[in-house]
Amino acid sequence: PIKSSAASDVYKRQYPGSFDPVTYGHLEIISRASKLFDKVIVLVSVNPLKPCSFTIDERKQFLRESVVAEGIGNVEVDSNEGLLIDYFNEHNADVIVKGLRAISDFEYEFQMAQANRKLCYKAETIFLTSKSEYTYLSSSMVKQIAMFGGDISDFVPECILDRINERLKRY
């Protein structure tokens, strides 16, 4: 892992997202980041342009349970309802980790990384590309399948599956 130079320092990498709900694609990025860095703060963020099906507390709980179920270490789950860069500064983070599924993700995330750098000169963004089996996977897709009673067990951890289905089933 990439460690800090001083024994008392811990590099803090933030992996922000809405995680509505968390998927195996998210968990794969979290797992890889946790192997690379001292600590990863998975940050449940609010995006006012994206209506959520689950509350912040539910999403945090889903993440905590999923990280444990998948055996992922070095992870802390938190939430933020403001600007990512404000949280970044308040918690002395040093890197923002973003997952990329496709080139279209890169275009958006690159713009966000540039905006974050403009707001805070020390904000570095590291991009981790998804494994090919997760390039199509999104929380929106999972929710749509669940709403129509489809099987989402290949997309989300078993420990949260029933709660997702219960909330989203329409028929």
Please provide the spans of the model-predicted regions:
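Single conserved hydrophobic/aromatic residue that forms the stacking wall/gate
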Residues: 1-11
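Structural beta-sheet core signal
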Residues: 15, 42-44, 127
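Classical nucleotidyltransferase
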Residues: 60, 79-171
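Cofactor-binding loop segments of dinucleotide-utilizing enzymes, especially the Rossmann-like FAD-
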Residues: 18, 45-47, 130
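Short, surface-exposed acidic-centric catalytic microdomains
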Residues: 27-84
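Residue-level signal for inorganic ion chemistry
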Residues: 23, 63, 149
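Residues at the starts of beta-strands that form the adenosine-phosphate
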Residues: 12, 38-41, 124
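Short, glycine-rich nucleotide/cofactor-binding loops
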Residues: 13-25
